[in-house]
Structures are given as structure tokens and as C-alpha cells.
Amino acid sequence: MGSLMQSEPEMEKKPIGIRFLERIKGSKLSYSAYQAIVLIVTFLAYASYHAARKTTSIVKSALDPQSPDTGLNSLLLRFTSFGSSVKEEGGWAPFNGPDGTVLLGEIDVAFLAVYAFGMYFAGHLGDRMNLRIFLTVGMIGTGLFTSLFGVGYWGNIHSFYYFLIMQMLAGLFQSSGWPSVVAVVGNWFNKKKRGLIMGIWNAHTSVGNITGSLIAAAMLRYGWGWSFVVPGVIIVVIGLVNYAFLPVSPENVGAERDEVLDSSSEKIGNSVNEPLLLSSSDSETDDKKRAVGFIEAWRIPGVAPFALCLFFAKLVAYTFLYWLPFYVSHTAIEGEYLSDETAGNLSTMFDVGGVVGGIMAGYISDRIGARAITAASFMYCSIPALFFYRSYGHVSLLANASLMFLTGMLVNGPYALITTAVSADLGTHSSLKGNSRALATVTAIIDGTGSVGAAVGPLLTGYISSRGSWTAVFTMLMGAAFVAGLLLTRLVMAEVAEKIAESRPSEECRSPVDYVQDHVMEV
């Protein structure tokens, strides 16, 4: 473990891939070239995390083909129309029994509970270790245990605890991903247009989900084991690319900013948008170099309400992530049931909507300078979208896809905004006094708390859908979306008050972010 600890920046070696590119070029890479490499490598890295994570939701119907269709038409109709060969084989023990849906829900919650638990420690370690190596180890470990879950197919393994342990270990290694990629991107990009840049970059979540869905659905015809092994191999390969090319920070590779930001364009009232993470040269005191503690990070104004909001936002988002293909395949659309592969492909519309929603939320929050108003508005608007999808999604494929797209846009928009731009804002809060070692910890706290909700949602869905109906599940999701918006009420009020103050020419303008942060000290 000691070998992973960061030494002085100037003593760290450049990644081998960077040295190779510079040898080919014959000179040092420009700062903008490094930024492009960071965006591409971290985008691919986290997309591969989500591709591996998405597999379970696609394979659910193959493992548990005899699950109750929760109040719709009988299973006989389902198996006589569009039933896949995998379904006809009777599923896979122990998931094809009467409690199969519950067992799959327990697998999901085990993965997400360990993921959430590991997230808190991942952020703490990420602020103290070489992020390139830390991220690489996480990706290789994720690929290994994702693949071992699939090996159960060829090994004829039917032990529930084998699959449970593989998912838990995969979740532990997956927790290394998000704090690491956000911290690295934060090292290279300043606050200007952060919401838009990170909104576009955050498309890796939906791109990974879409890719994982398509790969897993395509592999089902060859055996469900391949649906796990192929994404597992992909994330290992990308992990090696990450090790070879990822520059953790400008100081690590000796890069110098090749453009000077106009201070007048960076200033908002009396507030100046400083770089997302200050370099070590900007923080000369030991206090500024000290990594922020867990409790200290929780006390940063705004962290608690946004973290709790994300708890409910991810509860909704991850219920769709893990159960949407299963729900679609168990719902008669135009009177017919879809195959597992078709249902998996159709479910990608939720993630396509998520890409659009993430970009929209980032752009809107940049334009109006109000993160909380944007996030809360999206969450409130998602409530009628959820209602209409449940009520009219069965009418036709077009209606299902359109409403799924709209729901994904409204649910994933605030999720993307909070986990990227908001986390970066709070990780550089003025109360930190320039401390550059807080972003991974703050990101881990916010996303870790959200991941607890991500574990609760799929678990409740498994129990509710097997004992009640999908209408009850959607009622739960609408309630969660309402609470998510409600938790931001105080921040929204502060932002609205700031906007009113800004509209008065006699009053001195202040940064909306600073105003909100000053008025949530007690939250």
C-alpha cells in the first residue's frame, strides 16, 4: 500500500503512454492535449464501469424467466409470443424458483451496499494515493469479479452465495471509479462552464449503460455467461489504457497552462472563479496540503442537503438501471411480450434521455447560476413523467420509447448535475481555504450517500413487485422524486433570494454560489 502513496509531484514519472506520445511528437504535449487525453481516458474508464454494472439487469429475465408478471396477462401469453430460447430453458437455479425475483433483488442490494460502503473509503484513499494506479486496480478488480460471475454459467454453479460474493467484490472495486475520475478531471479544468463541460463528459454514464445493455443483450443468445465475461474483459483492457495514459494532474507531468484566463471574465461580483483544484504551488501551507477528513467534509455547507437529495435521486435512477429491462419484458406492449434481447435494447432509450438530461441540466445551471433550482425542477418534473410512463407505456412501442426517453432525461439530469458540477463546487468551497485535497472526499460522500439510495431502490422494487404490483413500485418512485426535490428547498429559496437581489441595480452583485453557501451553514 505504501508504494501507492503520492510522493512530491516533481518526482513522479509520466505514464508510459504519455512518454510514447511525446517521443513520437518530438516535444512535450500541450496543456490542451493533456486535457483532451484526460477527458477521453476518464470517459472510457467510467463508461466501462457502467457497462459492467448494467449487465445484471439485462440477464435478470434469463435467470428468472418464470417471475410473476405482476398483475398483467398470464405467463402463458408471454411464453407463446416472442419468448426467447433462453426463457424456454427454464432459467438458472437458484433464481428460477418462486423467490427468484427476491433473490435477484438481494444480489442488487448487496452489490450497491458494498459499493456505497466502499465509496466513502475510496474518496478518503483517493485524496492520499496515486489516482492512476488506484483507478487501474479498481478497473481490473471489477473486470475480474464481473467475469467470475459469468463463469458460473460454464461451471454449472447454482450456489446463491457464490453469485452474492462475486457481486459484492465487484461492487467494492467499482467504488474506486467515481471519486477518482472526478478528482482527475477536476485537476485539469477550472470552474468556467463547469456545468456544461461536466454535463457533456458525464454522458459516459449513459453511454456505458447503453453499451453494456447492447453487449449483454447480444451475448444472451450464446449463453448468459458471455454477457458478464465480455464487459469484464473490456473494462480490464481499458484499465490498462488508463494506466498507460492517464495524467493525474498538471504537476505530475510538468504541464504548464498555455493560456491565461481573463480575470474580468472569471469574476462575478466580488467572487473570482479559481481553478477547480489549486495546485500545490498555490497552497504553500501544510494546512492547505492536508487531506480533508471525513467529518470535516460533511460539514462543508451544502454537502448534506445535496447528498441526501442524491440518495432519493439515485434510488429512482438505479431502480430503472437494474429493473427496467425486466419490467419491459414483463409488460405487454400492444398486447405482446418482448424477448429479453428486444427489451434490453428498448431500455437504452432511458439512457439516451439521460445523456440529453445531463447536458441540459449542466447548461441550464450554468446559464442561470443556480444548481439547486435546476436539480429540484428536474426532480419535480420527473413525477408526472413517471406517472405517464406507467399509465401509457403499454400502448405502443413508440409511446413506450418516447415516455422512457422523457423519464430518463428528467431523472438522470439532476443525478448527473449533482455528481459532477455540484460536487466540484462543494469540493472547492471557500471554507476549505484553498485546500486542494478535498474533491475526491467530497465527491465520495455525495455519491456514496446516493449509492445507499441506489441500493435501497432495487431492493424495495424486488419485494414490492413480487408481492404487490408495478403500480406500487412507480408510486414509490414518484414519492422518492418528490422528497429529492423537497430536500433542496432551503437551497432553492436562497438562490431565488439571490436572483431577486441581483435584479436590484442598487445592490452589489454577489456570486449565486457564494450566496447559497453562506446561507446553508446550518444545513
UniProtKB/Swiss-Prot annotation:
PROSITE patterns: MFS. It is a multi-pass membrane protein. Pfam families: MFS_1. One of its GO terms (molecular function) is transmembrane transporter activity. InterPro entries: MFS, MFS_dom, MFS_trans_sf, Sugar_P_transporter. The chain crosses the membrane at residues 29-49, 102-122, 133-153, 163-183, 196-216, 228-248, 306-326, 344-364, 368-388, 402-422, 444-464, 468-488. GO terms for cellular component: membrane. SUPFAM superfamilies: MFS general substrate transporter (SSF103473). Induction: By inorganic phosphate (Pi) starvation. It is found in: Membrane. PANTHER family: GLYCEROL-3-PHOSPHATE TRANSPORTER 1-RELATED, MAJOR FACILITATOR SUPERFAMILY TRANSPORTER 16, ISOFORM B. Belongs to the major facilitator superfamily. Organophosphate:Pi antiporter (OPA) (TC 2.A.1.4) family. This is Putative glycerol-3-phosphate transporter 1. It comes from Arabidopsis thaliana (Mouse-ear cress).
